[in-house]
């Protein structure tokens, strides 16, 4: 009897422990005394319901018609448990379509977590804005900036365009911001008033929004800080991160004054901890949809989102529903070395890249700071998104009739892979577009984007269509460790119907997947023409047993392809954790695109060197002229070099001129020492018997040609750097293409010796 009592006690204790563990998961969520409800009867019906059921009506939620926020008169301000009985009573009312109690959402600002210049402006930090203007004199070196100066030279500086920064507030009286501040684009949803001024504290925690706004709209030529990308645009601030964040607050922020605001810039999202899967709530999702349909007088609001800083945590931005949305332009980062920085995340939804911080020795981003100060240490994808927003403001000034989808097409068609080509993971899709999970379609090129957007030649893209592909007879498929599930998906892309698609934009794979360890899943989707895309990579920190429920994995990697044919979905678990198990419950493939090919895509995309268009003191040179000059490029010592692809007769004719027509050893060594102070000490070249000994021009061009070819690495996928293998960034000794070129030349010198 005594033994039986002891057994019962142990069982009860074990049950209690399990109950506590399950409760602790829910306890993380803090519910607030706010209810959101959709009430088709409008304000009058909402007021009546509030009076009858004991609520205070707080008002309409943002720009969402028939959506209202209520506060219960007798409920506590916060609670660990949801008030299901109150929610049920509200949702059971025949006048209410749905109701939901609001809860706190964890949102992280996407700055990095701690673990002689053009004489155009008198702003003291202009010379440090390397990403806006290239300070180097030599035209042969690759560009480092975003090509904004040629746009400014046309008189396009963001005039008439309104951008609002959704963040922790805006120090609107800052000397470098005040002249461009727009109160109609500003609100404080944390304190519910019209002043977005940030809360000061000892740590300057709330500097984030002011820094992001400064990147966009710092004044030019006012002897303060630096220069904004769109320095004549108007900027506002939405204070919404310095307090409790709910779905209603996010929706109100995303949908704030959409008839006035053109561009919304957001550098935040769910925690970048490598284990969170979260996206917009019901209200925020509706705010996005309302914005693209009704914003900017029907042309659609432009939503710019930072792709995330969870790289060190092994995070994947496909698990972030904000960057993974078809309505946002997701922006990643590149360092001044032209590399993917340590904090950047990889995913198939990233559309493009702008510059930001990299290694600790790299330069960072300059902007305004709290207390009317300046900073040169803004970092992370937080700093990349506002630069992109500023570039889009330049495009909207040039062509105010651009739609939200026009802007995405412009980004896809003009972003450049050449300055980032030394990174692994580049692939050409079925439409001839270069794309990468780290960088999207490449580095933003302001001049190319604005030129293509010219209202005299640009044609708005055709109406958006949506085609849903699913198998109504699909039976759940089991998946275990070291196993895989392959699903063949044939489709005619709604051919013969009004929503037929011939040219793809976004692709969404919506799935419910039950699995014992979510982070061990790997999902790839291969298009009908063979473009393979990683929709989900493994996340070591994600030990959740919750899987995915109706989660949309979004990809832009098949942009421009014809979707007709058989697609292949592959879900695997190669973790080796034999206890893992689960199943694929259901899925559907959602194709977004157009029934006819957009005008600008009727000719293939032509990629040229990013240096083709100069935008600094070297002057602006027409692309066609540069192309014509290529067969007679000058060598480093001023003489002519014959390109490798010249005819054999021309090559033979110059054999006798090699000594005078190719770089000398002395010149190349001098060149290297100019770029690497330690080069001579690390690598002492042998004495040359002849100062006139030169490198054959064939070898010189071989060195150049090798720059864009990824090296092989043992153990990597297919003996090449895989799109999702980070070892490249840990093993490459030369971080910039300049250094790699110089090293290649020095290798040739050593071989000659």
From Swiss-Prot:
It is found in: Cytoplasmic vesicle, Secretory vesicle. Coiled coil: none annotated. Its EC number is 3.4.21.93. GO terms for cellular component: endoplasmic reticulum lumen; extracellular space; membrane; neuron projection; transport vesicle. Its main location: cytoplasm. Residues 460-597 form the P/Homo B domain. The active site is at 167 (charge relay system), 208 (charge relay system), 382 (charge relay system). GO terms for biological process: peptide hormone processing. The keyword Protease applies. Keywords: Calcium, Cleavage on pair of basic residues, Cytoplasmic vesicle, Disulfide bond, Glycoprotein, Hydrolase, Protease, Serine protease, Signal, Zymogen. Belongs to the peptidase S8 family. Furin subfamily. Involved in the processing of hormone and other protein precursors at sites comprised of pairs of basic amino acid residues. Substrates include POMC, renin, enkephalin, dynorphin, somatostatin, insulin and AGRP. This is Neuroendocrine convertase 1. It comes from Mus cookii. The lineage of its organism: Eukaryota, Metazoa, Chordata, Craniata, Vertebrata. The gene is Pcsk1.
